[in-house]
């Protein structure tokens, strides 16, 4: 009896020692992981220690909750909106990177997650029922296999009102059913995506860019709203956070992030020094340079590239807003929403910049941070209906400017 008790004690001591050894090995691996950089090393960790079934169940539960109600219709009644397929958290002074994409352009999220270290929000547009289903499967696969997606990304879905999205069943065979890592998901997405001409959806449904932008920036005190095929400079999120933490004086200021486009997107410049070198040899140029030079000209690129190099991000100079400037910017306070009547191509961003000006915001250009669009914007890369859409939205923009006079009767500013 006494011997049996001693044996049991020895067994439990041995079991406890084994459990402690496993725990120490996991802690050791985590400490080694903290010294590594890049998505590949993080994925290797999650291959050794995959997320618990509970965390995956939570992802599925969130998707089910978001999809169960059938979504809500937007103000026009043309679109069905599913908020919060994925959710993220942020503190009051955080800056969220807000973007929008068609389903095939979600592959750009990988590059954004590498460069932007803070919270990210993406609104996805699915033009067909099949795309809506693919979007939910992608949300499940990305959040199941990509730690950064679970931790930092909010995802919303918009589709035509006549369609409804359904909860994906990961057990069913399909394009993403057998994937095991984050990189595999993005690789598969790159293979099944059908890159097309800008705004050419292949349907009679309009791309609701401003609805998507508003949805992506909902709930954020500070947001940088960009196109999904743009990449921010390295450290931009950290620099903005430090600025906002040190001062609360930016409530009525739009902090302009200069935007460029690069001829070849094989290697995107990480810092201003790399960008300026490419700019000087013509590999990088101002955004929209070949389509609408005045749309970005007030940024004053020649002044910006010649600013002395600094380690801290700060506003470098003030620029009075003028038509048709449509800068990319970070702003807090009561920022006007994007007018959702503007769809497809033309005047969808400038209308919001115009209202920002009339509402009393000032524009200050940041010294170091920047955005780079992948590829030169060329007229031939747009769909045939671009000019007709532009003319339609031009008429709407004239009406919009008249409406601003009634909305801001005491403002001395006009567009």
Swiss-Prot record:
Pfam families: Glyco_transf_49 (PF13896). Its cofactor is Mn(2+). It comes from Homo sapiens. Belongs to the glycosyltransferase 49 family. It comes from the Eukaryota. The lineage of its organism: Eukaryota, Metazoa, Chordata, Craniata, Vertebrata. This is Beta-1,4-glucuronyltransferase 1. The chain crosses the membrane at residues 9-36. Mn(2+) binds at residues 227, 229.
